[in-house]
Amino acid sequence: MLHSLFRLTLLFYALFNALGSLPVFIALLKNFSFKKQQHIILRESIFALLLLLLFVTFGRGFFRLLGIILPAFQFTGSLLLGSIAIDMMKALPPQTETLERDKDEPIFFPLAFPVITGPAMITSTLGHMEEGIFPKKIVLGAIVLAWLFSLITLLLSSSINRLFGQMGLLALERLFGISLALMAGNLMLKALSTAFNIGYYVTP
């Protein structure tokens, strides 16, 4: 159980991509005081968690009503994960030029969604809840733990940026990208195995 919790927490933390989002937060919040920055990060992180829990709690029934099946979640999730992984492995810097021009305080968009909780995160958590390999309490626990670690990362953004520097952050992001790419491949194999009933077993 602890091993499953660790694996899911690592996956969800990579999907929150707090390290990769640091430049966006720094650019958006640089005109605010340190205390105000911490307040905004905490508020937007709470918004992001509530949004994710809302999808996890009620999203499954809604998508079932639309006739969307588990392999669709898995396949779409693998594509989204793969896309994020490619960007992370290339260590593409976020587009912050437009953000830097905006002096207004960001509320919900774009920090809570889609920077912290994005489509890939929503799809992945829904997929894990739907497939039932992991107990729901493990999935929910992993979501909260990953969110907490991401929040700590964002709150320490200034210190982390000074400690690792731009090159260090890019190296860490590439490392997470490689792990995420492997997870995406595993998820796609699961989707194909389920959809075509080819009998290929992929460990959860």
Swiss-Prot record:
The keyword Cell membrane applies. It is a multi-pass membrane protein. It is found in: Cell membrane. It comes from the Bacteria. Disulfide bonds: none annotated. The chain crosses the membrane at residues 9-29, 39-59, 66-86, 107-127, 138-158, 176-196. It holds the Pfam family MarC. Keywords: Cell membrane, Membrane, Transmembrane, Transmembrane helix. One of its GO terms (cellular component) is plasma membrane. InterPro entries: Multi_antbiot-R_MarC. The keyword Cell membrane applies. Belongs to the UPF0056 (MarC) family. This is UPF0056 membrane protein CT_852.
